[in-house]
């Protein structure tokens, strides 16, 4: 129960106290960590791999650079960035959830991604890095779970180097109305059933669907990035806006 004096936010469609949301989100990802990759493939029919490849292509990351893969989970982007930056570069896979971080570390080590990757448990709202550290920051399917998104965007801006760029890959608002209706039906009826069968957890995937609907749409997120200090902010609608990639620069 939320007391009248408490600051509130949303957890899916629920209204909760701000200090409760992080723990509630943590419970979701502790629950789904072991099935996260399998569920991503099933939920998106494998298309998430194309969305992530497009993000890599838009990142401009080069050999010798330093990259932060924030809310990096099981490390799909980190693995690709590790190859791009080479031995003279560095990639930090950061996630607030220790279960997801453990899965990412084990997965990447098993496929031989070692040497230029470090793992840090970190809250996006208060990143534990010095100012002007990173050439590029990505946050992939993570921003919608952050309690105070504006604070997190300012934190990302602070740790970017001048000339650096932020890429936010996230579920968004479909731009074709018939697709939007079909997407709603899939998200709220089929997705929880898949979660129940594969991960034995319908509730976490019901939260996923609800959190997507509560996330800012394309233009709202663009404005939020601009308010945080980012310049030349643009976005690309992927799969007719089911997902959007936002990119902004620190000059």
Swiss-Prot record:
This is Ubiquinone/menaquinone biosynthesis C-methyltransferase UbiE. Gene3D superfamilies: Vaccinia Virus protein VP39 (3.40.50.150). One of its GO terms (biological process) is menaquinone biosynthetic process. It comes from Citrobacter koseri (strain ATCC BAA-895 / CDC 4225-83 / SGSC4696). The gene is ubiE. Belongs to the class I-like SAM-binding methyltransferase superfamily. MenG/UbiE family. Its EC number is 2.1.1.163, 2.1.1.201. Methyltransferase required for the conversion of demethylmenaquinol (DMKH2) to menaquinol (MKH2) and the conversion of 2-polyprenyl-6-methoxy-1,4-benzoquinol (DDMQH2) to 2-polyprenyl-3-methyl-6-methoxy-1,4-benzoquinol (DMQH2). S-adenosyl-L-methionine binds at residues 74, 95, 123-124, 140. Keywords: Menaquinone biosynthesis, Methyltransferase, S-adenosyl-L-methionine, Transferase, Ubiquinone biosynthesis. The keyword S-adenosyl-L-methionine applies. Pfam families: Ubie_methyltran. It comes from the Bacteria. It catalyses: a 2-demethylmenaquinol + S-adenosyl-L-methionine = a menaquinol + S-adenosyl-L-homocysteine + H(+); a 2-methoxy-6-(all-trans-polyprenyl)benzene-1,4-diol + S-adenosyl-L-methionine = a 5-methoxy-2-methyl-3-(all-trans-polyprenyl)benzene-1,4-diol + S-adenosyl-L-homocysteine + H(+). PANTHER family: 2-METHOXY-6-POLYPRENYL-1,4-BENZOQUINOL METHYLASE, MITOCHONDRIAL (PTHR43591:SF24), METHYLTRANSFERASE (PTHR43591). Pathway: Quinol/quinone metabolism; menaquinone biosynthesis; menaquinol from 1,4-dihydroxy-2-naphthoate: step 2/2; Cofactor biosynthesis; ubiquinone biosynthesis. InterPro entries: SAM-dependent_MTases_sf, UbiE/COQ5_MeTrFase, UbiE/COQ5_MeTrFase_CS. One of its GO terms (molecular function) is demethylmenaquinone methyltransferase activity.
């Amino acid at each position: 129960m939320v007391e009248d004096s408490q600051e509130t936010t949303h957890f899916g469609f629920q209204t909760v106290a701000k200090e409760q949301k992080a723990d509630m989100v943590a419970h979701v990802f502790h629950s789904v960590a072991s099935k996260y990759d399998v569920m991503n493939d099933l939920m998106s029919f494998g298309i998430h791999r194309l969305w992530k490849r497009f993000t890599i292509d838009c990142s401009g990351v080069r050999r010798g650079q330093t990259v932060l893969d924030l809310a990096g989970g099981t490390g799909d982007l980190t693995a690709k960035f590790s190859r791009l930056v080479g031995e003279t570069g560095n990639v930090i896979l950061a996630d607030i959830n220790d279960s997801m971080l453990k899965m990412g570390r084990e997965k990447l080590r098993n496929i031989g991604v070692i040497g230029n990757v470090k793992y840090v448990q970190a809250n996006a709202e208060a990143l534990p890095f010095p100012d002007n550290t990173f050439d590029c920051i990505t946050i992939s399917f993570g921003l919608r779970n952050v309690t105070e998104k504006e604070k997190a965007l300012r934190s990302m801006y602070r740790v970017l180097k001048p000339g650096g760029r932020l890429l936010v890959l996230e579920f968004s608002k479909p731009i074709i109305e018939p697709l939007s209706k079909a997407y709603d039906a899939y998200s709220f009826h089929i997705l929880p059933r898949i979660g129940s069968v594969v991960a034995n957890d319908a509730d976490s995937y019901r939260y996923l669907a609800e959190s997507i609907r509560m996330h800012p749409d394309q233009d709202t997120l663009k404005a939020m990035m601009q308010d945080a200090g980012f310049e030349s902010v643009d976005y690309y609608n992927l799969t007719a806006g089911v997902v959007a990639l936002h990119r902004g620069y620190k000059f």
